[in-house]
Swiss-Prot record:
It is found in: Golgi apparatus membrane. This is Protein CASP. The keyword Coiled coil applies. The gene is CASP. Changing residue 648 to L: No effect on subcellular location when expressed in tobacco cells; retained in the endoplasmic reticulum when expressed in mammalian cells. Keywords: Acetylation, Coiled coil, Golgi apparatus, Membrane, Transmembrane, Transmembrane helix, Transport. It holds the Pfam family CUX1_N. It is a single-pass type IV membrane protein. May be involved in intra-Golgi transport. GO terms for biological process: intra-Golgi vesicle-mediated transport.
Length: 689
């Protein structure tokens, strides 16, 4: 997001002025990136990245070990926990130290690159100022051409109208005014662009400060997130065991509470039934009392009122008990729902933990075995021997022994001979290309010198012509003024025409000479530009060829290094030391040091490791798959095998088709004979009857 904002702000800011190219941005940008040495910083960043990846892998391994040790510590008995606590605490302390070292290394790497890039100037203003300067220059050149055209028109008018001195003065005044206006416009544009450049620099400084603050905040947040993740991991482990214990306790408590609530509900129901029975009994007594005597109404009013009061009181008690039962049932339902929700949560947590445990088990199962690790170690040692020459002779003997070693020796010797032949051919080609490049560079320098000389002569000739033309104009103007002041307008027309006829003829002849010379110079300039273009294309082609040959030489140097290391370990003991010395003498010290540096910079251990991994996958295949793969490679890689397989398949198809044809013919003949016999039998049968 920050990069896009920077780009949008760049697009919104106006381009710098033409004078800014002569000020600080362009030389500052060029000096900074020249001193920055980007290739060196890339190599340092690659090393730091590899180290960071290695530290991450080591930390993951240590964390797994600590997790296993903590798991063992929790499973251990209390007597063994005291003895295991010190080692576990020491492991955690070592892991904390390693994490702090990782953090310090990452912070130092970030601060180093940040300190170097903090003072980096933005190349956009310089490039924009150059583009704006080119645009302004093209505009000024177009205006200059227009002014030259106008000046030429004015001069032609002046040659035809020499008597109109007022017109000439007016045009000259207009020219001066236009020049002054142009200078003022240029000054205004320069001032505006300088102000815009200052504002843009201020904005870029503010943006850089904001970006620095944002990066610091991000770093702080990353540190806080790392610490919180560690704490959350520890809390999650503690909460898992606590939740299991709490779930067991809560299930037991909930069951006891449910049983108590059920007992209370049963007691309330029994009490409700007794009260309802009493209510019915009292109602029956009241009805019997009303039916027995009407005379005793006055006497029984008090008893009825008492009975009604007791009945209402009992009804209130019954309603209260019903409300209590309803409340107890709702509370019981809520408790059941909460208990079910908690059980679901606990089950989900347990399922998550079980899935995590299953993933950890799968990851442990996918880990390589001890045998595979030993094989990989051997391969890494062989890779070190091939790439870095950092293995001892004993390890090399253990890695490659017996018949495989003899086969490898023969193959390496054959490759060594081929590479020597290729190296000699490439040296010859390189010398030829270098000589051609030197010739082309010399020719290009000669042509550039010739072009510069011709440009200098053209400039000198134009200056001389302008000087001569200006002096003639000044002399003619003075003479015209003097003649005009001495004589009348009518009298001076004839001598003026007579005097200016030869001057106009001289000017026309001089213009013809200048035009012809200009055409010749233009033709020569076109020829030189075309030749320079061809030479540039040739130089580009030669540089590409030189880069290709350099890359081929680096590859050959790597192969020769491999052969030298192998011969140094094995072949020297068998009496081929002289051969190795002859091989080493093929390179001079300077060339060897140069290609050694390029080769060491371009070493990529991951390519060799991927090759070893591919070979390991091929070894892990079944016998049938390996036989199929090797036979396919053999058939596709050998010319004679391909031709043999082609003709073999054709012959096999021809044989199969001939066999099928003969079998079909035999079957047809046999069926035909049986049919003839059957027909003869049928014809002879009635005669026999």
């Amino acid at each position: 997001m920050e990069v896009s904002q920077d780009g949008s702000e760049r697009d919104k800011t106006p381009p710098p002025s033409s004078s800014s190219s002569s000020s600080s941005p362009i030389p500052v940008v060029t000096n900074f990136w020249k001193e920055f040495d980007l290739e060196k910083e890339k190599s340092l960043l690659d090393e730091q990245g590899l180290r960071i990846a290695e530290n991450q892998e080591n930390s993951q391994k240590n964390r797994r070990k600590l997790a296993e040790s903590t798991r063992d510590f929790k499973k251990a008995s209390p007597e063994n926990k005291l003895s295991m606590f010190n080692s576990l605490l020491k492991g955690y302390q070592e892991e904390v130290d390693n994490i702090t070292k990782r953090a310090k290394f990452g912070e130092n790497a970030f601060l180093n690159i940040y300190q170097k890039l903090y003072e980096a100037p933005d190349p956009f203003p310089a490039l924009a100022s150059i583009a704006e300067q080119d645009r302004k220059l093209s505009e000024v050149e177009s205006e200059n051409r227009k002014m030259k055209v106008e000046l030429e028109e004015f001069r032609t008018e002046a040659t035809h109208l020499k008597n109109q001195q007022a017109t000439i003065r007016r045009l000259e005044e207009r020219n001066r005014q236009l020049e002054q206006q142009m200078e003022e416009k240029i000054k205004e544009v320069v001032e505006i662009k300088q102000r815009n450049l200052a504002e843009e620099n201020q904005k870029t400084m503010e943006l850089l400060k904001d970006r620095e603050q944002a990066l610091q905040d991000q770093l702080r947040q990353a540190k806080d997130s790392v610490s919180t993740m560690q704490k959350l991991h520890e809390l999650a482990q503690n909460q898992l065991f606590e939740l299991r214990a709490q779930s067991d306790e809560e299930t037991a408590g909930k069951q006891s509470e449910v049983s108590l609530l059920m007992d209370e509900v049963e007691r309330a129901q029994t009490r409700l039934l007794t009260l309802e029975r009493e209510k019915g009994h009292l109602r029956s007594q009241l009805q019997t009392a009303n039916e027995d005597t009407d005379n005793k109404k006055s006497d029984n009013i008090d008893s009825n009122s008492m009975l009604e009061n007791s009945l209402t009181a009992k009804e209130k008690i019954i309603s209260e008990l019903n409300m209590e039962i309803h409340n107890v049932e709702t509370a019981l339902a809520n408790e059941r729902e909460s208990h079910v929700a908690e059980i679901k949560k606990l089950n989900s947590l347990l399922n998550k933990k079980d899935t995590i445990i299953e993933e950890m088990k799968k990851e442990l199962q996918e880990r390589p075995s001890a045998k595979l690790v030993d094989d990989l170690r051997k391969k890494v040692k062989i890779l070190q021997a091939v790439g870095y020459n950092s293995i001892e002779a004993e390890d090399w003997d253990a890695a490659t022994t017996g018949e495989e070693m003899s086969k490898m020796e023969s193959l390496l010797l054959d490759k060594n001979r081929k590479m020597e032949h290729e190296v000699t051919q490439l040296k010859v080609q390189l010398s030829e290309k270098a000589s051609l490049l030197e010739k082309a560079e010399a020719k290009g320098e000669e042509l550039t010198a010739k072009v510069n000389e011709q440009q200098r002569l053209i400039q000198k000739l134009e200056d001389d012509i302008l000087k001569g033309y200006g002096s003639k104009e000044r002399k003619g103007a003075l003479f015209d003024e003097w003649e005009f002041s001495e004589a009348g307008v009518a009298e001076q027309s004839e001598p003026m025409d007579q005097k200016h006829v030869p001057s106009e003829q001289d000017q026309s002849s001089m213009l013809k000479v200048i035009c012809s010379q200009r055409d010749r110079f233009r033709a020569r300039l076109r020829e030189t530009e075309e030749e320079i273009r061809r030479l540039k294309e040739k130089i580009g082609f030669l540089t590409d060829e030189l880069e290709k040959t350099k890359a081929d030489n680096v590859k050959l140097y790597g192969k020769i290094r491999y052969v030298q290391d192998y011969n140094h370990d094995k072949v020297v003991s068998r009496g081929s030391k002289k051969y190795v010395e002859d091989l080493e003498s093929g390179f001079s010290s300077d060339v060897e040091s140069k290609y050694k540096k390029i080769y060491e910079d371009d070493i990529n251990p991951f390519a060799a490791f991927s090759k070893k991994e591919r070979e390991q996958r091929i070894k892990d295949l079944g016998i049938r798959d390996r036989i199929t793969l090797s036979s396919g490679r053999f058939l596709l890689g050998n010319k004679y095998a391909r031709t043999f397989a082609f003709f073999y398949t054709i012959g096999l198809h021809v044989l199969v088709f001939t066999c099928l044809y003969r079998m079909s013919a035999y079957s047809y003949l046999s069926h035909g004979a049986e049919e003839t016999l059957m027909t003869e039998a049928t014809t002879n049968l009635p005669h026999g009857l």
